[in-house]
UniProtKB/Swiss-Prot annotation:
Family: Belongs to the imidazoleglycerol-phosphate dehydratase family.
Reaction(s) the record says it catalyses: D-erythro-1-(imidazol-4-yl)glycerol 3-phosphate = 3-(imidazol-4-yl)-2-oxopropyl phosphate + H2O
InterPro entries referenced in this protein's UniProt entry, alphabetically: IGPD_sf, ImidazoleglycerolP_deHydtase, ImidazoleglycerP_deHydtase_CS, Ribosomal_Su5_D2-typ_SF
Species whose genome carries this gene: Syntrophotalea carbinolica (strain DSM 2380 / NBRC 103641 / GraBd1)
GO BP: L-histidine biosynthetic process
Protein name listed in UniProt: Imidazoleglycerol-phosphate dehydratase
Length: 195
């Protein structure tokens, strides 16, 4: 059984093609008009041990918002499709990652219920040309379209780049844990019998 998905999203604001393979080795080929997101998605794939190919175009002449949000939408949809009925997955994942002076933590539950708890007090600032407030937009879009409960906690940090990078690395590791198959799990990990 191949746990993979292809998502095509075509709107008047963005055109995105995304391929995801859960049981990969962390290979990424990311081409979007938002360089900082290219970096974040590449390390997300690497630290999550899933293969990810993304080709995106967007109305970045307006700003990066639509592209970043739609990347979150597509990634969330891809996880839903790749996980299928969620038979045998661990469901929960958690990771805490240091990134130099930063410590970041992400917890996830593929419960089928969308909820984001985002405890990063980010200033209205930029890393390069990237508006850091778009990090929350990405995670909101992912949660809404993955049916996932995600808690993002920045424990501490000073450098904005390190803070965001630490969160994406922790997110990758948490995704790897939550989507991993466990032979002890018969059906789905829920007393309801369905996720």
């Amino acid at each position: 059984m191949s746990r993979s998905a292809t998502i095509d999203r075509q709107t008047q604001e963005t055109q995105i093609n995304l391929d995801l393979t859960l049981d990969g080795c962390g290979e990424a080929c990311i081409a979007t008009p938002v360089p900082f997101m290219n970096h974040m998605l590449t390390l997300l794939s690497r630290h999550g041990f899933f293969d990810l190919t993304v080709k995106a175009e967007g109305d970045v002449e307006v700003d990066d918002h639509h592209t970043v949000e739609d990347l979150g939408i597509c990634l969330g949809q891809a996880f839903v499709k790749a996980l299928g009925d969620k038979q045998g997955i661990r469901r929960y994942g958690a990771a805490t990652v240091p990134m130099d002076e930063t410590l970041a933590s992400v917890h996830i539950d593929f419960s089928g219920r969308s909820c984001l708890v985002f405890n990063m007090d980010l200033p209205k600032a930029k890393v390069g040309s990237f508006d850091v407030e778009l990090v929350e937009e990405f995670f909101t879009a992912f949660c809404n379209h993955a049916g996932a409960n995600v808690h993002v906690n920045l424990v501490y940090g000073r450098n904005l780049h390190h803070m965001i990078e630490g969160v994406f690395k922790a997110f990758g590791r948490a995704l790897d844990e939550a989507t991993g198959l466990d032979p002890r799990i018969q059906g789905v990990l829920s007393t309801k019998g369905k996720l």
